[in-house]
Amino acid sequence: MQTTIQQRSGASAWQQFCEWVTSTDNRLYVGWFGVLMIPTLLAATTCFIVAFIAAPPVDIDGIREPVAGSLLYGNNIISGAVVPSSNAIGLHFYPIWEAASLDEWLYNGGPFQLVIFHFLIGIYAYMGREWELSYRLGMRPWICIAYSAPVAAASAVFLVYPFGQGSFSDAMPLGISGTFNYMLVFQAEHNILMHPFHMLGVAGVFGGSLFSAMHGSLVTSSLVRETTESESQNYGYKFGQEEETYNIVAAHGYFGRLIFQYASFNNSRSLHFFLAAWPVVGIWFTALGVSTMAFNLNGFNFNQSILDSQGRVLNTWADILNRAGLGMEVMHERNAHNFPLDLAAAESAPVALQAPAIG
């Protein structure tokens, strides 16, 4: 019988903790960015779920007209949202301890700030964790670069846009219909559909979907035949097998004949770089567009650009968009004291011919 005696490690508890955090042998890599990511995302997720279910109405416009967003106050999954913090709070940081009571904090939309700030810190840390794991494994850092696109988009709608507009009440609500409401109001106030950076983002998202579907279907179809002509190719493979089944030469030949030769990649790395770069660059541009429109550098205005020989306006698609935007804007601003300036821009009639003497 043999007895094995293992010498106790002389490492301190802190050193053991550091080794565990940075170990790539863990089932899920933690990393130093993970130490920040885990608690912040847990806090954001917990607060979001509780607020979505049970938060009381929020005075989003700061005019004592609370808007209910939670399920217990009559909403469903589609209409429910975590309502942004009040316009009365503006850009002030509004943690729980800044409110006189918990009821006041809830009424002014404090949970929204708690969720978005923890969420943003969490996704920034997740991006850093992607780089950290790549570094530990000796990989190149492009995974976190690709992830920076949705991070930039989230930062644009939750942080940059409220900064530019002067209030967190202008941020995107955390819900399905709230997202659509944000998009409609954004079009009304900034004409985003006529902004080139938004157009690049649309090309990036839809083009990325198209290229992804084309690539996946082409790879799935380009099998190395392991069977005879008289039986199904599928008999030559087991799902999930380790051996290579895909022939890039065959795929290149097929696609080159389907479109034309130079539309097809014969280099796998070039192909996958293109598949990654196309949507990422498109979403970068959209985030940049939202960030510039946050400061009212809006989309192109081609309203009433075409006139006939008599000076009458010939409406174009730009004029149709403008009319739709005006309608969305007056529905959005329910309180009359904040009437949209572009609708109130008619010539003002004097109410007094002479200013009264003062004193």
Swiss-Prot record:
Chlorophyll a ChlzD1 binds at H118. The D1/D2 heterodimer binds P680, chlorophylls that are the primary electron donor of PSII, and subsequent electron acceptors. It shares a non-heme iron and each subunit binds pheophytin, quinone, additional chlorophylls, carotenoids and lipids. D1 provides most of the ligands for the Mn4-Ca-O5 cluster of the oxygen-evolving complex (OEC). There is also a Cl(-1) ion associated with D1 and D2, which is required for oxygen evolution. The PSII complex binds additional chlorophylls, carotenoids and specific lipids. This is Photosystem II protein D1 1. PSII is composed of 1 copy each of membrane proteins PsbA, PsbB, PsbC, PsbD, PsbE, PsbF, PsbH, PsbI, PsbJ, PsbK, PsbL, PsbM, PsbT, PsbX, PsbY, PsbZ, Psb30/Ycf12, peripheral proteins PsbO, CyanoQ (PsbQ), PsbU, PsbV and a large number of cofactors. It forms dimeric complexes. [CaMn4O5] cluster binds at D170, E189, H332, E333, D342, A344. Chlorophyll a PD1 binds at H198. It is a multi-pass membrane protein. NCBIfam families: psbA. GO terms for biological process: photosynthetic electron transport in photosystem II; response to herbicide. SUPFAM superfamilies: Bacterial photosystem II reaction centre, L and M subunits. It comes from the Bacteria. Belongs to the reaction center PufL/M/PsbA/D family. Photosystem II (PSII) is a light-driven water:plastoquinone oxidoreductase that uses light energy to abstract electrons from H(2)O, generating O(2) and a proton gradient subsequently used for ATP formation. It consists of a core antenna complex that captures photons, and an electron transfer chain that converts photonic excitation into a charge separation. The D1/D2 (PsbA/PsbD) reaction center heterodimer binds P680, the primary electron donor of PSII as well as several subsequent electron acceptors. Its main location: membrane. The chain crosses the membrane at residues 29-46, 118-133, 142-156, 197-218, 274-288.
